[in-house]
From Swiss-Prot:
This is UPF0246 protein Ssed_1188. GO terms for biological process: response to hydroperoxide. It comes from the Bacteria. Belongs to the UPF0246 family. GO terms for cellular component: cytosol. The lineage of its organism: Bacteria, Pseudomonadati, Pseudomonadota, Gammaproteobacteria, Alteromonadales. It comes from Shewanella sediminis (strain HAW-EB3). Pfam families: H2O2_YaaD.
């Protein structure tokens, strides 16, 4: 089972990672091409392109300038511990056991606008470049055109290395659009999380993001390998709703919080 998640805008480079083990990102040559394009942008261009404040634009201009092809624990941090945000709050990487960390390295991949596809322990220099950014580049006018088949090929490689043909999509639509489902060498499962509010069950972004992280944690801690194993997920009050589910889209519901 290979699990795909989105990155996060919020980064933590202040606190130490939960392990000293690390690997190097595999698609750095592509990242370097994007960095070259980003370095051409003035802070005002970044602010407009990314729809961020002048302060955040200035910070990211500095990050693009200081980015180096040489990765070390001095200028980078393992992706699983660098990202913060709702998904990563649900996952709570800081409390993972060594066994779950090892499973994550094999069975979890993080989609990234700059790095393409990251393993959890891949070192990552700080950046902000969302997959939906319309950054002109040598391959087109956006990052989907830039990455083309590269990310899908890496997902298929990871599938072959980890031993089965199940992809669990816990990423946002923005990021999963960088993957080509018809080219995947496996079956795709996209869990849906619904919370009850005002008498109706609906997908509420904040809760759904945390639920995705909690499901990642559940998969890692329990060594889940099958669809039926996924349906036993019951963290934080969620329960499997068989009546609304399909083999491709299991639905999990929760009562009003």
């Amino acid at each position: 089972m290979l699990v795909l998640v989105s990155p996060a805008k919020t980064l933590d480079y202040e606190n130490k990672a939960g392990t000293i083990e690390h690997t190097l990102p595999k698609l750095v040559q592509h990242s370097e091409q994007l960095i070259e394009e980003c370095r051409k942008l003035a802070p005002s261009d970044i602010a407009s392109l990314m729809k961020v404040s002048d302060k955040i634009a200035g910070l990211n201009a500095a990050r693009f300038t200081s980015w180096s092809r040489d990765f070390s624990t001095d200028n980078a941090k393992q992706a699983l511990y660098a990202f913060r945000g709702d998904v990563y709050t649900g996952l709570d990487a800081d409390t993972l056991s060594q066994q779950s960390i090892e499973r994550a390295q094999k069975h979890l991949r993080i989609l990234s606008g700059l790095y393409g596809l990251l393993r959890p322990l891949d070192l990552m220099q700080p950046y902000r470049l969302e997959m939906g950014t319309r950054l002109a580049n040598i391959k087109g006018t956006n990052l989907y055109q830039f990455w083309g088949d590269v990310i899908t090929d890496e997902v298929n490689l990871a599938l072959s290395e980890q031993g089965d043909q199940i992809v669990v999509n816990l990423a946002s639509n923005e990021y999963f659009k960088a993957v080509k489902p018809k080219s995947l060498n496996g079956s795709l499962i996209t869990p849906i999380f619904k919370d009850r509010k005002n008498g109706q069950y609906k997908v509420i972004s904040f809760f759904a993001k945390r639920a995705r992280g909690m499901m990642v944690r559940y998969i890692l801690d329990n060594n889940i390998k099958t669809f039926s194993g996924l349906t036993e997920f019951d963290a934080a009050g969620y329960y499997y709703c068989e009546a609304e589910s399909t083999a491709q889209a299991p639905v999990f519901k929760r009562e009003e919080q």
